[in-house]
Amino acid sequence: MPKASEIKKGFAIESNGKTLLVKDIEVTTPGGRGGAKIYKMRCTDLTTGARVDERYKSDDVVETVEMNKRAVVYSYADGDEHIFMDNEDYSQYTFKHNEVEDDMLFINEDTQGIHIILVDGSAVGLELPSSVELVIEETDPSIKGASASARTKPARFASGLVVQVPEYIATGDRVVINTAERKYMSRA
């Protein structure tokens, strides 16, 4: 069984008799010498859908649940649901909007590298690629000669995501966004 420091976002863990899907991990180091790092894991209970916070020291052993990942593509939205299709057997997986709301900020019909997380044969979440290409829908006009400065400006994408980009980037530009940090990486 892995230690808390080895658990990543998207892992399924067992805690207090509940199966939890790790949605976010926050690492804090208490003051003082040799203080063990504390891992605060924001999770979703897979049976009730409730949000649960768990805290572990870096050397605590965490029980993981066996899970499978399958490559999928985003198909379409149907009301309050998002439908993803398996790349191999073309089966469809449906998620409620509130279950994948944060992930949908990075997903459009062209997004490649999405994986679905299956626990006991049922779909419990999505794993995004480390970076995605998105087209800027709206940003302030670019300023001539601004490439020498390191100033940034907000850019909005069709999904509703807002990211700080360099001043020389314009509306309609295709850019690469880091999905974990929600930051601009480069032009596509």
UniProtKB/Swiss-Prot annotation:
Pfam families: EFP (PF01132), EFP_N (PF08207), Elong-fact-P_C (PF09285). One of its GO terms (cellular component) is cytoplasm. One of its GO terms (biological process) is peptide biosynthetic process. Disulfide bonds: none annotated. GO terms for molecular function: translation elongation factor activity. Transmembrane segments: none annotated. InterPro entries: Elong-fact-P_C, NA-bd_OB-fold, Rib_uL2_dom2, Transl_elong_fac_P/YeiP, Transl_elong_KOW-like, Transl_elong_p-like_YeiP, Transl_elong_P/YeiP_cen, Transl_elong_P/YeiP_CS. SMART domains: EFP (SM01185), Elong-fact-P_C (SM00841). Coiled coil: none annotated. PANTHER family: ELONGATION FACTOR P (PTHR30053), TRANSLATION ELONGATION FACTOR KOW-LIKE DOMAIN-CONTAINING PROTEIN (PTHR30053:SF14). Belongs to the elongation factor P family. This is Elongation factor P-like protein. It comes from Vibrio parahaemolyticus serotype O3:K6 (strain RIMD 2210633). The lineage of its organism: Bacteria, Pseudomonadati, Pseudomonadota, Gammaproteobacteria, Vibrionales.
